[in-house]
């Protein structure tokens, strides 16, 4: 069995200043050549990818397989029961759009679960490298202090904190970053001792699009439109997807919602190009807010003139309230024993903010007074925002700020979630020509296909508690499965 701690220590031992400078120079060249930037910020700012052992990856896959039936059951129940659906706090226009049959069964053919995963065991490192410049870095934590902490009794900890069921970004970024890392001098040295396998994602996206299209009734070869505003910082990823789709023989354009018309039963880009398959990256809420419910794309999808992935019905589970629905004791009767065990194991205690009584730590309590009194134990999240917008970390807010945020949440739907451990690992970067290693917090975000299984993983690093590249700062790194060579 491969020991992750040993592998990372060995990688860092290979990364002297000379190899670090050479690797960083090559990475900088590749990031610019392939336009791997989020707006004007490079996607990756460190010199090591994320490593997982096969056992750790299988643990993630098993957990996703265990929890997804509960999400699926919640979605099916919500579609058929308006009273139950009210728990998701959909707006009036969302209630209208989820009535549109997308033409295929999965509400989210492409999705991502955002999690915090602290694998175990990680044995203490017996090796120090005092001669390395990294050890001299001001503010660097001592080796070992930032390693993922095990849970009670030494088990791994894995908590699902958000389900991105609408527009899961970065599969193409991940693929290209994997290629970039494979060619670095440091990886050439590391691969002599470890097998390193990537987790590609673009082909899964293409499969999901085509499966949905054929289910929808498409017979001709589709023309794909990647749909989002032209000014978004993720535009460079759309270019990567366009290049990939075209390499597989599919005509593809990148189109701004403002460029569409719906005329004579056809969805037209630039007024002339018929589109029958939409890879939707624009947020439905932004599309409706900026363009209205009579927008060409909304009309075309509603009238079965175009297939769209993900469909309007993805909004039900994309709401952060979906985790509250799973976690709430009032809904426990819906789930099988296996589903309930998965919820208890992986979903942190989560509730929609309201004046109510509920169960917490085995007792019935008044929700709002508890949240006010124990702010350091909770995080407050708007039900339908992205990029870290509106999130309030109770342990970083003063009492006045926290109580004001709670009051505001009574009017604008929000969830409160019990604080989870934030794992960290040491990652090297080049600072003023020398390799320096700092502990960085990280999340682990499995890609989920058809609401069923996991393949691929997004890893984000940060020195702040809010791990989100959109929120500013941070770094994306590709994730590899590693095994020590015999």
Explain the meaning of each model-derived region:
Residues 1-486:
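Preference for protein termini
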């Amino acid at each position: 069995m491969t020991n992750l701690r040993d592998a990372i220590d060995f990688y860092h031992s290979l990364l002297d200043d000379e190899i670090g400078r050479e690797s960083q120079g090559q990475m900088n060249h590749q990031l610019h050549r392939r336009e791997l930037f989020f707006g004007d910020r490079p996607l990756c700012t460190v010199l090591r990818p994320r490593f997982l052992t096969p056992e750790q990856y299988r643990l993630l896959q098993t957990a996703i397989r265990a929890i997804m039936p509960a999400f699926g059951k919640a979605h099916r129940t919500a579609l058929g029961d308006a009273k139950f659906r009210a728990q998701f706090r959909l707006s009036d226009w969302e209630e209208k759009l989820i009535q549109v049959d997308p033409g295929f069964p999965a509400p989210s053919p492409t999705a991502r679960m955002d999690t915090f995963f602290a694998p175990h065991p990680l044995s203490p490192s017996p090796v120090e490298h005092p001669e390395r410049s990294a050890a001299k870095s001001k503010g660097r934590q001592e080796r070992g202090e930032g390693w993922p902490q095990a849970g009670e009794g030494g088990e791994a900890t894995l908590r699902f904190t958000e389900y991105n069921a609408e527009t899961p970004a970065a599969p193409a970024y991940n693929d290209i970053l994997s290629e970039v890392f494979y060619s670095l001098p440091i990886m050439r040295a590391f691969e002599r001792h470890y097998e390193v396998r990537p987790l590609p994602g673009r082909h899964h996206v293409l499969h999901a699009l085509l499966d949905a299209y054929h289910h929808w009734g498409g017979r001709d070869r589709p023309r794909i439109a990647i749909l989002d505003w032209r000014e978004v910082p993720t535009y460079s990823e759309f270019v990567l997807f366009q290049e990939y789709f075209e390499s597989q023989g599919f005509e593809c354009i990148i189109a701004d919602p403002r460029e569409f018309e719906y005329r004579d039963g056809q969805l037209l880009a630039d007024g002339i190009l018929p589109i029958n398959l939409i890879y939707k990256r624009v947020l439905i809420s932004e599309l409706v807010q900026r363009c209205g419910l009579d927008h060409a794309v909304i009309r075309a999808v509603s009238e079965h003139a175009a297939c769209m992935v993900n469909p309007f019905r993805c909004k039900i589970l994309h709401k952060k309230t979906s985790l509250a629905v799973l976690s709430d004791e009032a809904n426990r009767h819906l789930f099988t024993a296996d589903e309930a065990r998965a919820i208890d194991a992986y979903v942190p205690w989560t509730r929609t903010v309201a004046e109510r009584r509920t169960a917490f730590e085995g007792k019935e309590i008044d929700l709002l007074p508890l949240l006010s009194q124990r702010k350091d134990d909770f995080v407050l999240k708007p039900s339908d925002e992205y990029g870290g917008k509106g999130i309030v970390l109770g342990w970083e807010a003063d009492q006045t700020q926290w109580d004001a945020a709670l009051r505001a949440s009574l009017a604008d739907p929000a969830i409160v979630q019990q604080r989870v451990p934030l794992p960290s690992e040491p990652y090297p970067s080049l600072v003023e020509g020398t390799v320096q290693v700092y502990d960085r917090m990280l999340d682990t975000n499995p890609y989920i296909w058809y609401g069923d299984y996991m393949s691929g993983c997004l890893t984000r690093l940060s020195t702040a508690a809010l791990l989100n590249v959109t929120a500013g700062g941070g770094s994306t790194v590709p994730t590899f499965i590693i095994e020590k060579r015999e």
